[in-house]
Amino acid sequence: MTRAPASQSPHRIALLFNANKVYDREIIAGIGDYLRSTRVAWDLFLEEDFRCRLAGIERFDGDGIIADFDDPAVAEALRGCPLPVVAVGSSFEDATQYPPELPYIATDNRKLVSLAWTHLIGAGLPNLAMYSLPVAQENRWAQERELAFQALGRKEGVPAPIYRGQATSASAWNQAIEQLSVWLHSLPKPVGVIAVTDARARHLLQACLIHGIAVPEQVAIIGIDNDPLTRTLTRIPLSSVIQGTEEMGKTAAHLLHQMLRGARFPGQRILVPPVGINVLDSTRHEPLSSPHVMRARHFIRQYACQGIKTEQVADYVGVSRSSLEEYFRRELQCTVHQEILRHKLDAAKAMLASRDASSAEVAIRCGFTSLQYMYAVFRRELDCTPREYQDSVANASAPRLSTP
């Protein structure tokens, strides 16, 4: 009869991240995944509101730290720390920017930007630009994305304009959006714009909606982070590059686990590539010759789920209903009503897949006149009911267990 192994005292580990950002939250989630998939016993210290506060960190009576080194204050506070530390943050073109004495897990900025660039070029956009952040120590990662963007421009022999805009503040918000719209109007069209974060991408969408710039016909927009909260705040679903943040968290936890057992990795750098792109409406660019169709689709994307009719679209565009129908038949081989219905159906499919609402709620929120009408549309277009569609999505995403 074998004895059970003696229980080990858990290691006390501090996680210094600001989980109000999706980037930090997903790194923390990756650390949690590592703990669940191993027999590691860690007592994790985080602030109750998941914010990073450095006061007293020098007196932390623990065994190790995983920290966000994109925050200059964190990097400074941990300089010379006697505990094992794993740094997490941005990749750098200049290798001297990495902390020389620590292992460093980095998001690969060059690959993030390259993936966004390739996606926009593949969508048929001949012009590209970037919307970044003002230069600041805490924004060094954004400047690294600028360098990657400019390098691609030089490699391809094309212009690579960058606009940094203003830092976000309530007092300067209106002015910032106005200046952003001026820059957007100055760009050759059609253009694809890479925003250094989803938050900056939302600014672009706001400016386009306020000033009647068609997305994605005139300006296609892609962000970085795949932040679900940002998606809820935009009328036009935002395409975004998915960072490998959970893998970064797992890798950081794995390194610290080894360090707690005596291993050392001074100066080791591990670059983690992006997972892929969540492609949504903001980059589904289709070259169109008719400005009337561009303007109509811009309006439909915003208001399809609010029960708009063909007459309202024609009024917005400023042409007769019959003329608009003719433009649609030539360009899209469909009617205006069919285009409105397509957007309603796409919205309903997305809501059903998320399982956040009942079928009746989906019908109301997606602008169908009744639940019965939504059922009829699903039957006609997808040959299934909304419930059957929801079940098929759930079954497709369920994990498959291999049999021995």
Task: Please report, for each region that a protein language model flagged, where it lies by residue.
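Bacterial carbohydrate/catabolite-sensing allosteric modules
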Residues: 1-64, 74-316, 321, 325-326, ...
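Residues within the helices of the helix-turn-helix
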Residues: 311, 337, 360, 376, ...
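A secondary-structure capping/hinge motif
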Residues: 328-335, 377-389
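Intrinsically disordered, low-complexity serine/threonine-rich segments
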Residues: 398-400
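Intrinsically disordered, low-complexity protein-interaction/activation regions
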Residues: 402-404
